[in-house]
């Protein structure tokens, strides 16, 4: 499946409030088409990122400006979500401490943490999907213009907050520790998964369905090429997702 289609599918299936936060891939392609092809007129050359404001057309400037705006959009959203997750984790800790004597409350908290964990997986997917889109649209730009902007721009991207998922990984591990704390010690992982799958309300969760869709897209992106390069995504940090990927067909069937 082409990347543009995968991105559109993911946007359609993600949380409604996230839909305008993804890469404006279609708009970037439209702006790229307005740029005249120059590959036949000039040799390919590698430029520094700050050199792209010299001797380029208005259409190229508009394209590059949108790229910069997209980076700002990604960073603002990503940092905002990380800050929100820090607060929510603290709230979960407080609620767990107060609900230890109430099985009903603990079950409710458990479901909420599962959704919360899924949302953080969505944010990991958000980072990977937008990074991949930038790599692909910049490859098209280089091919059309004869310039080599992809490498310097991606080197800049690698330093951006939305690409740095270390804190997100830490938050995910903390949420998993909470789930281990809530689940009965004598309950095996397979029993826990089966119990959650059997709960109708849980399976109707928008977070659950969005997470499944995100995992499928993330799997497609990472399995699309076996060639490792400077533009490749880093190894996936969220432990346990490989096992979750294996369960995607079953999860999708149960979630319908």
Swiss-Prot record:
The keyword Hydrolase does not apply. Its main location: nucleus. GO terms for cellular component: nucleus. One of its GO terms (biological process) is positive regulation of cellular response to phosphate starvation. Disruption phenotype: No effect on Pi accumulation, due to the redundancy with SPX2. Spx1 and spx2 double mutants have an increased root-to-shoot growth ratio and a reduced rot hair size when grown in Pi-sufficient conditions. A motif (Bipartite nuclear localization signal) lies at residues 30-46. It is found in: Nucleus. Coiled coil: none annotated. Induction: Up-regulated under phosphate starvation. Residues 1-155 form the SPX domain. InterPro entries: SPX_dom, SPX_prot. Keywords: Nucleus. Plays a positive role in plant adaptation to phosphate starvation. Inhibits PHR1 DNA-binding activity in a Pi-dependent manner. Interacts with PHR1 in a highly Pi-dependent manner. This is SPX domain-containing protein 1. It comes from Arabidopsis thaliana (Mouse-ear cress).
């Amino acid at each position: 499946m082409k990347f543009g289609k995968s991105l559109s599918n993911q946007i359609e299936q993600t949380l409604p409030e996230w839909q305008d936060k993804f890469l404006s891939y279609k708009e970037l392609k439209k702006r790229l088409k307005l740029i005249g092809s120059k590959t036949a007129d000039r040799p390919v050359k590698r430029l520094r990122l700050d050199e792209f404001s010299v001797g380029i057309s208005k259409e190229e400037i508009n394209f590059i400006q949108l790229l910069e705006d997209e980076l700002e959009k990604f960073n603002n959203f990503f940092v905002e979500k990380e800050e929100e997750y820090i607060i929510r984790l603290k709230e979960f800790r407080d609620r767990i401490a107060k609900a230890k004597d109430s099985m009903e409350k603990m079950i409710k908290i458990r479901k909420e943490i599962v959704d919360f964990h899924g949302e953080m997986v969505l944010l990991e997917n958000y980072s990977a999907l937008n990074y991949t889109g930038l790599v692909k649209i910049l490859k098209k730009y280089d091919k059309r213009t004869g310039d080599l902007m992809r490498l310097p721009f991606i080197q800049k991207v690698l330093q951006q907050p939305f690409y740095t998922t270390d804190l997100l990984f830490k938050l995910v591990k903390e949420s998993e520790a909470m789930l281990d704390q809530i689940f009965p010690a004598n309950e095996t992982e397979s029993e826990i998964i089966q119990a959650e799958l059997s709960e109708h309300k849980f399976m109707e969760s928008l977070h659950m369905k969005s997470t499944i869709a995100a995992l499928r897209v993330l799997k497609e992106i990472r399995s699309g090429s076996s060639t490792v390069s400077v533009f490749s995504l880093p190894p996936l940090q969220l432990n346990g997702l490989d096992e979750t990927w294996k369960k995607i067909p079953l999860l999708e069937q149960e979630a319908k």
